[in-house]
Regions:
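Acidic/histidine-rich catalytic neighborhood of metal-dependent amide-processing enzymes
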Residues: 122-123, 205, 229-318, 346, ...
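Soluble metallo-hydrolase cores and metallopeptidase-like ectodomains found primarily
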Residues: 73-104, 157-235, 246-261
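Active-site-adjacent substrate-binding region
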Residues: 305-435, 496-500, 504
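Noncatalytic luminal/extracellular "stalk/propeptide" segments of secretory-pathway proteins
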Residues: 2-13, 17-110
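Extracellular/luminal Protease-associated
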Residues: 77-168, 334-335
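C-terminal non-catalytic alpha-helical accessory regions
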Residues: 407-415, 420-557
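Second-shell loop/turn segments in exported
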Residues: 2-9, 23-31, 84, 95, ...
């Protein structure tokens, strides 16, 4: 079996046929979604996979309609999941730039509907709600972008049941928003407005399909992605689903040569459940994931028209080497920089210590326009233009994909799987993950000064890296693979998880080693608050000590 043969087998025509077949309509816990899962079941079965379907309980939310008028003029708007419905909310409309929403005075926004810029984001809504705003309307791109307004990752628990925003939210296009801002300015800063929204939030059964190709070992690599969509969702995410189907077609005949198994796991609940599908699947299979899942390869938003930037895709320290190899082999990319995973991309498996690589592998170059401005406010200044002006809009149709770009991106994923399934030594570097954690802890120690002592943990991480490097030379490959997996089940949660490994942190930005984030606040706290924060931080150090001790035992066993 030659790796180049696997890459050469990727077929752009088949990929686009799969995309069109999967695009059964807007897929949001409805009949179109059922049809799409039926299509996927047939495609995976025809490819030669062992296919199972599950229905897992989850909380989802779908926008059912919205109306908005200001100063007697009606505007087309969309409302957003996980926000309350509003039946004719009447209030004055005011404009507040998005970079001032966190500092606006209550006098400025209280009891008013606030018009602001960018994609509909929960932190912005939360800041305005805390200041007494009655509702929020966002100015997005040339097309109105769908977003989910929630910090709750997956379905709520009793602890997070009341963490949703309590005011209605809508979005309008950049053109309408610009004209409305001009009218507000002419009117002296306020206009009478009326906002109505209908949002249906409910518990339902979230479908998950798993297509397995069994190799020589029960340990497995998984390729994951979401089926649900805004509009036809060709880019987001029929492209990622088609990637999974194409990889299954290519790999199934090679099962007897595979050293490890592969599972293609696709779910709903991403767009309208804030990752409720991946979260529910993790919860249902946690022990197996922790023990036997070697790698999570997330497949999302592939092959976009004009998507030529291939240097920024996410990876963990343990998978950066594999990412570089795959991008170089499959796409000739030699300047990949990558980035750390953010709290997004269905990354629901950190608590189980699963190494992850990729989500998208290609993005748009920076561009001018309203959509670019909106993406910039969401993703930061960045070095890309995101996923295109059609992302999360009704214009995300198959013509927004470039067949050659799609095949190129799928070849990158094919390279990842070729190495992960057929290499004698699994190309996941546990020592790199250990060393990155050590470096992050050194940075936290420098900030904390004498307030906290991480020296014992840092010394243990040095010993752990040395032990892994020594056993990598002496162990047989399979034994070392098992050893590394046990180490990563301890180290990855320390690097990425703030709370319990069995629950899921909020869908908000977090620093590396988030359990130590209070260090950044120590200097600004009162003595009483600082002492309380130090109690929490000392407990975090205990967690670091316990997990690194277990990891060192695993490395030396």
């Amino acid at each position: 079996m030659a790796y180049e043969d696997i890459l050469a087998a990727v077929d752009a025509v088949r990929l686009m046929d799969s995309v069109r077949a999967i695009c059964t309509g807007e897929r949001l816990s409805n009949e179109a979604e059922v049809r799409s899962f039926d299509v996927l079941e047939k495609l995976f079965t025809d490819a030669g996979c062992r296919v199972t379907r599950e229905a897992l309980p989850g909380y989802v939310s779908t926008p059912e309609g919205a109306a908005f008028e200001a100063g007697g003029i009606a505007y087309e708007v969309l409302t957003h999941p996980m926000t309350p419905s509003a039946d004719g909310l009447e209030a004055d409309l005011v404009y507040v730039p998005v970079d001032r929403t966190g500092s606006a005075s209550a006098e400025e926004v209280s009891g008013r509907i606030v018009l602001t810029d960018g994609l509909a984001m929960e932190p912005v809504v939360r800041a305005l709600e805390d200041r007494g705003a009655a509702g929020v309307v966002f100015i997005t791109g040339e097309e109105i972008h769908n977003m989910i307004v929630s910090r709750v990752w997956g379905s709520p628990t009793p602890e997070t049941l009341h963490d949703y925003v309590g005011i209605p939210v809508a979005s309008l296009s950049f053109g309408d928003g610009s004209r409305l801002r001009a009218r507000l300015s002419e009117a002296g800063g306020t206009l009478p407005a009326r906002l109505s929204t209908r949002v249906e939030s409910r518990w339902t059964e979230i479908p998950v399909i798993t297509a397995e190709i069994r190799g020589a070992d029960e340990d497995f690599v998984m390729v994951t992605g979401h089926v649900d969509s805004w509009g036809l969702g060709a880019l987001d995410n029929a492209s990622g689903n088609a990637c999974a189907v194409e990889l299954a077609r290519i790999l199934a005949p090679l099962a007897s040569d595979m050293r490890r198994s592969v599972r293609f796991v696709l779910w709903s609940g991403h767009s309208h459940g804030r990752y409720a599908g991946s979260t529910a699947w993790c919860d249902a299979h946690f022990e197996e994931l922790e023990r036997h899942c070697l790698l999570n390869v997330n497949s999302d938003c592939l092959g976009g028209r004009g998507a030529t930037v291939m240097t920024e895709s996410p990876a963990m320290a343990s998978t950066r080497g594999l990412a570089r190899t795959a991008l170089r082999e499959a796409a000739g990319v030699t300047d990949w920089r990558g980035c750390r995973f953010s709290r997004s991309c269905d990354q629901s498996f950190w608590g189980a210590g699963v190494p992850s690589i990729f989500s998208q592998v290609s993005e748009q170059p920076p561009f001018e326009g309203a959509a670019a401005d909106a993406f910039g406010k969401m993703f930061g200044s960045g070095r890309t233009g995101g996923f295109g002006a059609w992302w999360h809009t009704r214009t995300d149709t198959p013509d927004k994909l470039d067949p050659e770009n799609l095949a190129r991106d799928v070849r990158v994923f094919a390279s990842v799987l070729a190495h992960a399934l057929f290499d004698e030594r699994l190309p996941v570097d546990a020592a790199a993950e250990v060393l990155e954690l050590r470096d992050e802890l050194k940075a936290w120690q420098e900030k904390a000064g004498d307030s906290l002592d991480l020296s014992e943990v840092l010394a243990r991480l040095d010993l752990l890296a040395e032990a892994l490097e020594a056993t990598a030379r002496s162990d047989d490959p399979k034994r070392f693979e098992k050893r590394s997996r046990r180490v990563l089940s301890e180290i990855i949660p320390l690097a990425y998880v703030e709370g319990s490994v069995y629950s899921h942190d909020e869908a908000l930005r977090a620093p590396p080693v988030p359990m130590l984030r209070l260090i950044d606040e120590l200097a600004s706290l009162s003595e009483h608050e600082r002492n309380a924060a130090l109690v929490s931080l000392r407990r975090a150090v205990n967690r670091l000590k316990a997990s690194t001790a277990r990891a060192l035992e695993a490395a030396r066993a």
